[in-house]
């Protein structure tokens, strides 16, 4: 019906091409260099275009069917793609409802291009505020309607080769799609700073993929949101699931999960189902059940941040596991250990045993805390998720304080000589209870001392008044309970205030809520200090404005003793990895001496291990600082 061509247009590099509908063509002047060094002139060859616009210097060739209703940018390479079309009006995956946590519905999260882990958490978990959910749905629907179009878009610098069908998909700049089977109703939010790769045999429908993601090798997904820098490969399958920044999923299966930042599952036999996770490391054969064969798959579970599941672990939902816990064995009695962070949850004799605080002295916990920031693969300057990596924070310390009270209460009610204590469908041994109190106490001393030292560091003061001025809180927020919004650690009151603002203001926007999360993330340490000041009367018996230099000295000494004690526990735990048992299988055909030499060649010497050196230096530095 109509064809628009740009200045300097030449048809010399258009062959075996059919046009219909409204067509707009750029110029074809440059050569494109392909992998292996092959150079091709840009142009159109063996392709049928209907209602399409093509930018400058793109190469499109060998399209068996056709391309319809697409705006294609400049410098694109599209080759051997069966079919690319937009059919009817589409929001390109925006406002797709994902039945997360409960497969039968009730916690649906409508996904959109800029969905953050924090907003998704509120939509999924705050169903006790139907007014809030209704307002957020309205805002997301309005955003999605703004994306609606009869034309799909393929951005600049996109490569699509050897691919099957692409239907109703928005494709951002510099995306690479290679050997993909089928993509339907979605958005791929690639950009120059953080390109997206969609690889061989991927099938996806009703999805949104964020910048920097890598999806390849037979992944099958339906009704999913994939966050920034996520990595899904090796036949992984998922439906009705949300994956946020830096998740890594391979081989296994996910059904209706809320995978907060750094959720990692790598093994074929692992099934994550109907659970909320973040900073998770799932061992091989890790499984859960959300179905008791009565009213359907209606149960859910929460594994708080930083937890690990060992090989063949199993949890029968509903259950709730505390932050930074280790889960070993099968647990079918619905434990709630959220009040006991850094614990071991171990099955023995068909009973769930809890070892409070045991993970505080585990070298693996500290390694995790160090590696998470280093493994942040997000290169997009516009980061959607707010991520706090701190092991010790008001969120975990408040739970330890509650844990100390709970453990001491168990001793009083059941007697100090009791062999075992019952707690939330778990059993705590007497020795574990007493060690748990000691470990939690050390951790609180470490956190409180850290906070005070950081507050005073680099700030000279000449008298007591100047000391108190420096210690005075500078943020009005921070007192009371803190919560973990899937990566963002924040005062509960601040979230409540934001919810009230959203509900009470009919003109509130998604951008304002994004800004709120970012502001809370920036203000974390100021709010943390406000919280520290609020618990000083309980922990030290004095308010912050009553602390004397002698009190500061005492606090720093307690901090130093706690830090060094915990570091020595880590040192001893690391030494176990170099024990005689760890050497079994080394020097397979040699003598004992050859076994030890083989071990040292492969694993190195204990004193030269990088982590061991770090712990030793940490002990020296903190001792000197103290």
Q: What label would you give each PLM region?
A:
Residues 18, 43-137, 161, 167, ...:
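Phosphate-/polyanion-interacting regions in eukaryotic proteins
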Residues 1-5:
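Short, small-residue-biased leader/transition segments that mark boundaries at the very start
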Residues 6-28, 32-44, 61-143, 178-179, ...:
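Glycine-rich hexapeptide-repeat left-handed beta-helix
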Residues 138-155, 160:
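A charged, amphipathic alpha-helical module
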Residues 348-626:
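Long, compositionally biased intrinsically disordered regions
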Residues 154, 158-177, 182-193:
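Core alpha-helical transmembrane segments of integral membrane proteins
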């Amino acid at each position: 019906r109509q064809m628009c061509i740009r200045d300097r247009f030449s048809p010399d590099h258009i062959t075996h091409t059919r046009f219909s509908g409204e067509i707009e063509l750029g110029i074809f002047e440059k050569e494109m260099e392909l992998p292996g060094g092959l150079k091709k002139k840009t142009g159109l060859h063996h392709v049928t275009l209907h209602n399409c616009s093509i930018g400058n210097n793109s190469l499109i060739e060998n399209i068996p069917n056709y391309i319809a209703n697409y705006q294609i940018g400049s410098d694109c390479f599209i080759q051997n793609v069966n079919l690319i079309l937009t059919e009817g009006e589409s929001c390109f995956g925006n406002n797709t409802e994902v039945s997360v946590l409960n497969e039968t519905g009730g916690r649906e999260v409508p996904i959109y291009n800029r969905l953050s882990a924090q907003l998704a958490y509120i939509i999924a978990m705050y169903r006790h505020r139907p007014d809030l959910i209704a307002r957020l749905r309205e805002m997301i629907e309005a955003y999605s309607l703004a994306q609606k179009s009869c034309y799909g878009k393929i951005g600049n610098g996109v490569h699509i080769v050897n691919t099957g069908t692409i239907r109703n998909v928005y494709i951002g700049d510099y995306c690479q799609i290679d050997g993909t089977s089928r993509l339907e109703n979605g958005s791929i939010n690639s950009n120059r700073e953080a390109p997206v790769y969609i690889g061989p045999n991927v099938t996806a429908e009703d999805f949104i993929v964020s910048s920097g993601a890598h999806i390849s090798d037979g992944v099958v997904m339906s009704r999913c949101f994939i966050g920034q820098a996520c990595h899904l490969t090796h036949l992984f399958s998922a439906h009705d699931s949300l994956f946020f920044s830096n998740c890594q999923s391979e081989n296994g299966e996910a059904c209706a999960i809320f995978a907060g930042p750094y959720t990692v599952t790598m093994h074929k036999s692992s099934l994550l189902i109907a659970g909320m996770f973040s900073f998770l490391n799932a061992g091989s054969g890790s499984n859960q059940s959300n179905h008791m064969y009565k009213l359907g798959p209606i149960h859910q579970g929460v594994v708080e941040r930083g937890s690990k599941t060992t090989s063949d672990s199993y949890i029968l939902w509903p259950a709730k596991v505390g932050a930074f816990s280790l889960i070993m064995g099968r647990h079918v009695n619905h434990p709630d250990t959220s009040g006991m962070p850094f614990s071991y949850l171990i099955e023995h004799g068909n009973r769930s045993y809890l070892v409070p605080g045991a993970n505080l002295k585990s070298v693996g916990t500290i390694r995790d805390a160090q590696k998470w920031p280093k493994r942040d693969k997000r290169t997009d300057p516009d980061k959607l998720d707010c991520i706090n990596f701190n092991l010790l924070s008001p969120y975990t310390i408040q739970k330890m304080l509650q844990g100390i009270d709970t453990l001491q209460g168990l001793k009083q009610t059941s007697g100090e000589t009791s062999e075992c204590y019952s707690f939330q469908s778990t059993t705590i041994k007497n020795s574990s209870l007493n060690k748990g109190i000691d470990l939690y106490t050390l951790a609180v001393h470490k956190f409180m001392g850290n906070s005070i030292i950081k507050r005073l560091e680099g700030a000279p003061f000449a008298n007591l008044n100047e000391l108190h001025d420096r210690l005075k809180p500078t943020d009005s927020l921070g007192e009371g309970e803190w919560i973990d919004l899937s990566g963002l650690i924040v005062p509960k009151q601040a979230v409540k205030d934001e919810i009230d603002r959203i509900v009470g203001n009919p003109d509130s926007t998604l951008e304002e809520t994004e800004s709120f999360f970012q502001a809370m993330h920036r203000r974390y340490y100021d709010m943390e200090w406000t919280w520290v000041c609020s618990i000083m009367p309980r922990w030290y018996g004095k308010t912050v404005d009553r602390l004397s230099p002698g009190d500061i000295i005492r606090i720093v000494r307690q901090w130093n003793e706690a830090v060094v004690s915990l570091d020595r526990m880590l040192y001893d735990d690391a030494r176990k990895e170099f024990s005689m048992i760890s050497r079994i299988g080394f020097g397979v055909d040699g003598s004992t001496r050859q076994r030890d030499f083989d071990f040292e060649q492969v694993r190195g010497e204990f004193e030269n291990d990088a982590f061991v050196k770090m712990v030793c230096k940490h002990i020296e530095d903190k001792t000197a600082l103290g």
